[in-house]
Amino acid sequence: AQVADVDPARTVRENILDGVRPVLELIGRFERLPPHSPEAAALEARIAALDGWTIDTRLNELVTSLSAPSLSLPAANLSGGELRRVALCRTLIGQPDMVLLDEPTNHLDTEAISWLETYISRGRGTFVCVTHDRAFLDAISDRVLELSHGGLYSFEGGYVEYLRGKADREATAEQQELRRQRFIRREIDWIRRGP
């Protein structure tokens, strides 16, 4: 579904930071520790491993790059496109290993689309995108999957390579079907002639 799962009772900032809530909880725990606590070094290393010390930088980059609304606005006042951008920021701020994006370029301007292409192409994690935006698909893809007639077909490369591979697959299937029909005609002729 292309519905943004954003809490209308919270601000843009709070909704986006939900994407890193576990890391923020670790930071809060770290900040409450007494100085020179034996737990501090291990907790600090864990936060660093999760890239927790860069959350504010990532937040500002995402909001700016994806043209998200002001961080202080309540989500209840946002348009559908703004809600989708907030949800996209929330997803990306957590730097997940795998992301499923449904029509990610909807409601993005050309600068935001260009930034998203670069972000995805940097290669941190796996991105599975469902999109009709062929230029975006060609820019970000190293593999295209097609679901067709009950089959799943995989094509190495972007959209252009997909079109070539699909044309080759369809031409091969057409040749196989012609051979099958010729064989059936020969069998029917043989049956009609009798043994």
Feature roles, as predicted:
Residues 1-178, 191:
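ABC ATP-binding cassette signature C-motif
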